[in-house]
Amino acid sequence: MKDFPKKNIVILGNGISGITAARHLRKRTDRPITIISEEHPYFFSRTALMYVYMGHMPFEATQPYENDFWKKNNLNCIQASVKNINGQKKYLEFKNGETMSFDVLIIASGSKPNQLSCPGNDLHGVHGMYHKQDLDRLESLSHSIKSAVIVGGGLIGIELAEMLHSRGKKVTLIVRENSFWNRVLPDAESKMINSHIEAHGIRLLLETELKAINPSEQGGVKEVITNKGEVIPCEYVGSTIGVSPNVDFLKDSGITLGRGVLVNSFLETNLPDIYAIGDCAEQTQPQINRRPIEAVWYTGRIMGETLAKTLCGKREQYR
C-alpha cells in the first residue's frame, strides 16, 4: 500500500471541479495532493474534442496547462482506474490490484453517458461522445463509416452530427421530441434550428425513437430500426441521450448514494474526510430553485473553490 509521510489528499477525477480544488488547495497548503483519472493524466477541455476530430486543433491544444505545470506545482497526476473505495479504512483499490491510502478523499468523478436501452446497444460502433476514449474510438472507425445515426436532441448530439458531417458522412439525427431542444428553447428558435440542421444536409427525424440496432456479420452495426418501422442502414450509432453521475464504482464503499454521491452544504459525505464535488455530487438539501445535481462547468468550479477553503481551515458552505 502506498503511503505518504504527510496527511495526504487524493482527488478522484481531473475535470474542472477536481482540478479547481487541486489548484486552490495548492495555493493554501503544501500537503501531498494526488489527482487520479482513468481518462487522461492531465486536465483538458472536453468541449474541444469535436474540434480535434474536425481537424481544427491537435489534442494537445485542448490542455490549458503545459504537462510540466503539474510537476512544478507538486501535483501528482496518475492515470489509473479505481475499482472500489474502502471508506472506513481509507484506501482505494485499483483495477490492476494495487491500493493507495488517503487521509482526505475528494470524489470528482464527473458524469457518464447514458446507454441506449434497445437491443444492439453493446455492438461495436455504438457509443457516446463524452470521453477522450470515445474520440479515439470514433477516429478508428471513421474510415469504415459511410452513414451514421445520432440519437438524442441535445448539444452533444448536434455536435456529433456536425463532426461526422464535416467528414462527408451521411448523418441522420433522431430526436424524441417534436422539435430540437424544445425543452430549453422557445418554439420559434427551436424550429429555426430544425431548418438549419436540414439545410446543412443532415436528416432530422422528430418524434422518433430507436427500437433496435441490428448487427453486421462482422459484429458491428448494420442498421437501426425506429419505432415507426423505418430501417436506416448505417455503420455507426452515436448515443447522446444525456448523462448520469459516475458513481457505480462506489456501491460497496460505505458512502451513501442517491443518484449521485449525497453531500451536505459543506460537500461532506456521510463518512469523515470524504467529500464530493462536481457532476457526481448530489445535494441532500439543495437551495430553493436549484437542482440536487448541477452538472454545469461553472458550479463545478465553484464547488472546487469552496471545498478547498474548507479543507484549509476556512469552513464554507457551497452556495
Annotate each PLM feature.
Residues K2-L75, M163-L185:
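Beta1-alpha1 glycine-rich phosphate/pyrophosphate-binding loop at the start
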Residues K6-N8, S144-S147, E207:
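Phosphate-coordination loops involved in phosphoryl transfer and adenosine-cofactor binding
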Residues G13-I16, Y130, G152-G154:
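Glycine-rich Rossmann-fold phosphate-binding loop(s) that bind the pyrophosphate
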Residues N76-F94, M100, R167-V263, R315:
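A Rossmann-like FAD-binding core segment of flavoenzymes
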Residues F94, I107-A108, I150, T226, ...:
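Redox-cofactor binding/interface segments in oxidoreductases and associated redox assembly factors
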Residues N96-S140:
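Glycine/serine-rich phosphate-binding loop and adjoining beta1-alpha1 elements at the start
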Residues D122-S144, E217-G220, E230-K309:
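FAD-site-proximal beta/loop scaffold in flavoenzymes
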Residues R137-L185, V221:
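Rossmann-like NAD(P)H-binding beta-loop-alpha module
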